[in-house]
Amino acid sequence: MYSGAGPVLASPAPTTSPIPGYAFKPPPRPDFGTTGRTIKLQANFFEMDIPKIDIYHYELDIKPEKCPRRVNREIVEHMVQHFKTQIFGDRKPVFDGRKNLYTAMPLPIGRDKVELEVTLPGEGKDRIFKVSIKWVSCVSLQALHDALSGRLPSVPFETIQALDVVMRHLPSMRYTPVGRSFFTASEGCSNPLGGGREVWFGFHQSVRPSLWKMMLNIDVSATAFYKAQPVIEFVCEVLDFKSIEEQQKPLTDSQRVKFTKEIKGLKVEITHCGQMKRKYRVCNVTRRPASHQTFPLQQESGQTVECTVAQYFKDRHKLVLRYPHLPCLQVGQEQKHTYLPLEVCNIVAGQRCIKKLTDNQTSTMIRATARSAPDRQEEISKLMRSASFNTDPYVREFGIMVKDEMTDVTGRVLQPPSILYGGRNKAIATPVQGVWDMRNKQFHTGIEIKVWAIACFAPQRQCTEVHLKSFTEQLRKISRDAGMPIQGQPCFCKYAQGADSVEPMFRHLKNTYAGLQLVVVILPGKTPVYAEVKRVGDTVLGMATQCVQMKNVQRTTPQTLSNLCLKINVKLGGVNNILLPQGRPPVFQQPVIFLGADVTHPPAGDGKKPSIAAVVGSMDAHPNRYCATVRVQQHRQEIIQDLAAMVRELLIQFYKSTRFKPTRIIFYRDGVSEGQFQQVLHHELLAIREACIKLEKEYQPGITFIVVQKRHHTRLFCTDKNERVGKSGNIPAGTTVDTKITHPTEFDFYLCSHAGIQGTSRPSHYHVLWDDNRFSSDELQILTYQLCHTYVRCTRSVSIPAPAYYAHLVAFRARYHLVDKEHDSAEGSHTSGQSNGRDHQALAKAVQVHQDTLRTMYFA
């Protein structure tokens, strides 16, 4: 089962568990990869020339605290001007907007703390701030040079931070900073997304250490902002009114709830006090309209009377409200009862939208932002020219120069693996540009389907019996060709309505039809029925379900039916195809388990829902079949809390499936940012070791821990136009880079394993944080690329290895399992899985998959 020719890997060198507090060190790069044909590329990295000087780091303390960064920057700007003669002279300090200030020459304050008073001219009255400055340290750029050339073991974090602040100082004052990007409203043309939101374009910028050089990573970026507009217009967009005139009555409860959800937390400015445009943050929307909403008003006599908002505006501001039937915004602190009519408020410009975009907004966003690779390359070059870092006075102050041209990189295009099918002819497919097809091929192991049912939740007048009959015939034909014969008609084919009928119907099916293998469920577009089908099928009754959209039943195509068969065969225990055993890397010579792990977090702006951790493990030698484990954990917790128990479950399952104990564990971990590497590695590597030792004291398989990152801004472009692939002109599938733009000393590489269809391909970044198995670069890169070809849902290579992708699917499916029928409205909750006050135990039970589903790939 685990045989195969090829060189034997260095046997794993398990290290004993370190003492707590010991920091694991990622392994050094073993070598550089050599396999594959070379390809000339350009990367959106720009070489920086850094002098070997010291930078002086000071800590600022601004009182009163909690000012936005923008205000802090203004304070520092005023401070530098005001105290030019006494302290700053001709120096141009740079500031991160919080506490850190850097200068190229020391300030004449020695090591003492200096207290200064700074006045900011404000609207109405000036504001006075107290600022203290204290020396922190000397940041040596010489040390950075030593680290980049490998003379120092690790890159000093404080130098990267200092350089980043230098490079960001001017853009932060010119544009709206968001994370590591800068945005600005599009001049003259807006890009509306609907619902009061619009697209802003900008650029991402970060300083990155690489082999021998510091690099500046520059990319185009886009995000959603709220449109600066009157709140009256915002209401119309959110509630789909053509104009406010068509709303002559007060808002209904559901309209008010929807509006509140959108406007809560946003800043508005008032328009009824002339030049005094005070800004407030919205904390709520009143239930009552302005004509009825009262508040306690203190009169001159000292008496307090209840007064309506409409009356107050008429008496105090001589303003008769045009829309007294609309509610008010409650602003500031909830207990203070400050109410503003909608019509005197505007949405403040430059507020980023952190709430989840709707499906329509997301697709509009993608259409607005997708750029072919050559277009993106040109846009980045344009950005570099307009940023002109070499004339930026702050960058020059520190003696930094940035090259204008993108960095030339030599990449390699890896050979795709051969894919083996089954049936009589055991056909072999060879992917071309990451794609192959199943025509004239049969599944490696096809499942025979004897007892199956259809439940149609689409209305009968739209999805008729004729449609169902034709769909059934076509599906049976395609499935027979694919080697997954569906014998006979469905044992049950009925129409149903609404999520409430799912469980009774499924119970009836399970009790009535012995040996029922599959329920095909037809859905009318987006509906809460989907979540309920998966909850009941996966967690309550343990039944295999396959949902199909009504439009794909009304009009069948061989492609959609074939895709359905890929999913059905796997859910029922079949194997679609395998990697050709002779072509697999040597790691397969001994029993090996591939684990994929991911944590998904609830959408921003949602403080209650739990995060969901999922870990999947391979269950055969191909590797094709996987088993899943899933847990709910603390909101926004990135480390997988219960990893030891999850890995233990998967190792037991692997042993039951194969009768082998894996001698190696290859762990692909998705969703970790660089800042969390150390923390995640420390906790999770120990957890995997603990899982092994709990099974057997002496059991110490070699562990390789690889972080997979998709959310980065590295983009690669073909230097030679003839190498470009497809309409979007992307790099070919299999393109790998492990030199020049990668880490100076650690083991990392970029691999673009998929064929880009829309926009510019994003290569995945792999960073090896631990490696007992002593992989060479070639071995790990080939293995990773091959695993990207084992994803069962399609006949193409995907952008990350199948185990990491499956972990993502499992966590995403668990969100549906958490949808609480009793409390969740279908609107907006379809994947949000609200936890509505359910305790941890109830949530944990909700994601627990049924015993019969546990060993299947229900998530496929």
Curated annotation (Swiss-Prot):
Keywords: Cytoplasm, Endonuclease, Hydrolase, Hydroxylation, Magnesium, Manganese, Metal-binding, Nitration, Nuclease, Nucleus, Phosphoprotein, Repressor, Ribonucleoprotein, RNA-binding, RNA-mediated gene silencing, Transcription, Transcription regulation, Translation regulation, Ubl conjugation. Its EC number is 3.1.26.n2. The lineage of its organism: Eukaryota, Metazoa, Chordata, Craniata, Vertebrata. One of its GO terms (cellular component) is cytosol. Belongs to the argonaute family. Ago subfamily. PANTHER family: EUKARYOTIC TRANSLATION INITIATION FACTOR 2C. It comes from the Eukaryota. InterPro entries: AGO2, ArgoL1, ArgoL2, Argonaute_Mid_dom, Argonaute_N, PAZ_dom, PAZ_dom_sf, Piwi. Residues 588-591, 651-661 are annotated as: Interaction with GW182 family members. Its cofactor is Mg(2+); Mn(2+). The modification 3'-nitrotyrosine is found at Y2. The Piwi domain may perform RNA cleavage by a mechanism similar to that of RNase H. However, while RNase H utilizes a triad of Asp-Asp-Glu (DDE) for metal ion coordination, this protein appears to utilize a triad of Asp-Asp-His (DDH). This is Protein argonaute-2. Interacts with DICER1 through its Piwi domain and with TARBP2 during assembly of the RNA-induced silencing complex (RISC). Together, DICER1, AGO2 and TARBP2 constitute the trimeric RISC loading complex (RLC), or micro-RNA (miRNA) loading complex (miRLC). Within the RLC/miRLC, DICER1 and TARBP2 are required to process precursor miRNAs (pre-miRNAs) to mature miRNAs and then load them onto AGO2. AGO2 bound to the mature miRNA constitutes the minimal RISC and may subsequently dissociate from DICER1 and TARBP2. Note however that the term RISC has also been used to describe the trimeric RLC/miRLC. The modification 4-hydroxyproline is found at P701. Pfam families: ArgoL1, ArgoL2, ArgoMid, ArgoN, PAZ, Piwi. HAMAP family: AGO2. PROSITE patterns: PAZ (PS50821), PIWI (PS50822). The modification Phosphoserine is found at S388, S825, S829, S832, S835. It catalyses: Endonucleolytic cleavage to 5'-phosphomonoester. Residues 230-349 form the PAZ domain. It is found in: Cytoplasm, P-body; Nucleus. GO terms for molecular function: core promoter sequence-specific DNA binding; double-stranded RNA binding; endoribonuclease activity, cleaving miRNA-paired mRNA; endoribonuclease activity, cleaving siRNA-paired mRNA; Hsp70 protein binding; Hsp90 protein binding; metal ion binding; miRNA binding. It is an enzyme of class 3 (hydrolase).
